[in-house]
């Protein structure tokens, strides 16, 4: 599904996407289109893109094609989703200890919509860190 979502092909395009969006959250999936984890995540992102279009815009970035942010954002996972609002990285507390990003494939579409909505609401209030509506600290346990 990655071909259906807009790709950013260089660091300048990524910066412009983050800078130019005034009223919506910029959701960027860093990873590879061929990676199974990314494919799962892309399918979820594509399926919710229409639902969240009023408060979020979704982009994909290939970390091999655009290595500019790999060190800065510690993009070592096969699939990483990050949130930005008005040129500011919005952190999200998912209960996993890593508040910078989502580094696994979300399988539940509604959960992803809820997270993006929570990020949007918190960011509009000026918060740099928002708390996820669901705690993912036990996601690997059960």
Curated annotation (Swiss-Prot):
Plays a role in pre-mRNA splicing as component of the U5 snRNP and U4/U6-U5 tri-snRNP complexes that are involved in spliceosome assembly, and as component of the precatalytic spliceosome (spliceosome B complex). GO terms for cellular component: cytosol; nucleoplasm; nucleus; spliceosomal complex; U2-type precatalytic spliceosome; U4/U6 x U5 tri-snRNP complex; U5 snRNP. It is found in: Nucleus. InterPro entries: Dim1, Thioredoxin-like_sf. Disulfide bonds join 38-79. This is Thioredoxin-like protein 4A. Component of the precatalytic spliceosome (spliceosome B complex). Component of the U5 snRNP complex. Component of the U4/U6-U5 tri-snRNP complex. The U4/U6-U5 tri-snRNP complex is a building block of the precatalytic spliceosome (spliceosome B complex). The U4/U6-U5 tri-snRNP complex is composed of the U4, U6 and U5 snRNAs and at least PRPF3, PRPF4, PRPF6, PRPF8, PRPF31, SNRNP200, TXNL4A, SNRNP40, SNRPB, SNRPD1, SNRPD2, SNRPD3, SNRPE, SNRPF, SNRPG, DDX23, CD2BP2, PPIH, SNU13, EFTUD2, SART1 and USP39, plus LSM2, LSM3, LSM4, LSM5, LSM6, LSM7 and LSM8. Directly interacts with CD2BP2. The gene is TXNL4A. Pfam families: DIM1. It comes from the Eukaryota.
């Amino acid at each position: 599904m990655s071909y259906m979502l807009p790709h950013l092909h260089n660091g300048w395009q990524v910066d412009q996407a983050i800078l130019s969006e005034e009223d919506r959250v910029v959701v960027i999936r860093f990873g590879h289109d061929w990676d199974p984890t990314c494919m799962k995540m892309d399918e979820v992102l594509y399926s919710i893109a229409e639902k969240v279009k009023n408060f979020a815009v979704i982009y994909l970035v290939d970390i091999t094609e655009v290595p500019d942010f790999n060190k800065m954002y510690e993009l070592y996972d096969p699939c990483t989703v990050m949130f930005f609002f008005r040129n500011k990285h919005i952190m999200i507390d998912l209960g996993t200890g890593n508040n910078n990003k989502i580094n696994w494939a979300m399988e539940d579409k509604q959960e992803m919509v809820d997270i993006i909505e929570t990020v949007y609401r918190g960011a509009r209030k000026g918060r740099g860190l928002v708390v996820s509506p669901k705690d993912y600290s036990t996601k690997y346990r059960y």
